[in-house]
């Protein structure tokens, strides 16, 4: 297991349920549905999905759910507020190490295109990995939902799509708007009422509670809405996504338990 800054233990992973075949995701909605599904698991689980394309190439989707524990003192479960604080401060964190180890254990190849998808805290982890894994893996795209990632960089060669709800204040916790860059698109949806607005426009707040506004399943529904959105910026993300998902692919999914293990002195 990997520790902060190297070997030691924090962020270790273990197989949870082995591998299973399932239908391959076909778009943004399917990807976020998987993230929401993993968030309902009984433990701190991340998913690594292998997509075997008809031409013999392979793509990978890495799914990272959100925070499970409000604990500020680091415990065994790394999906906690201690990880949030580390991510916000730019410090090493157990989740980033754990997801990287899950990718290594799953067999992700250095040249295989990878999509990193995450909800809330998981989106911060995915965005950090887009930078930290440069030179180790080929990160093609990042998909976040309800995540405060405005102050986090995304490398020029990575295409990112950020989903937010107008009534959800969690994406604003870092105090920084998402950059308006050629490789980064933000879609903000106002709940309820459907429809989506591109690049940070907010269509007026409606009285939805934070529970709904910050729900992983609500974001999965928003992702499905965005799938139907006609916009050049979203089309750019779809092109990157297609390079990972392929067409007519065969999917094999693995799930990994992630734990914060005390480093050995």
Model-assigned labels for residue ranges:
Residues 1-6, 14-112, 134-265:
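Alpha/beta hydrolase fold serine-hydrolase catalytic domain that processes acyl esters and thioesters
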Residues 117-127:
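Gly/Ala-rich beta-loop-alpha elbow adjacent to hydrolase catalytic centers
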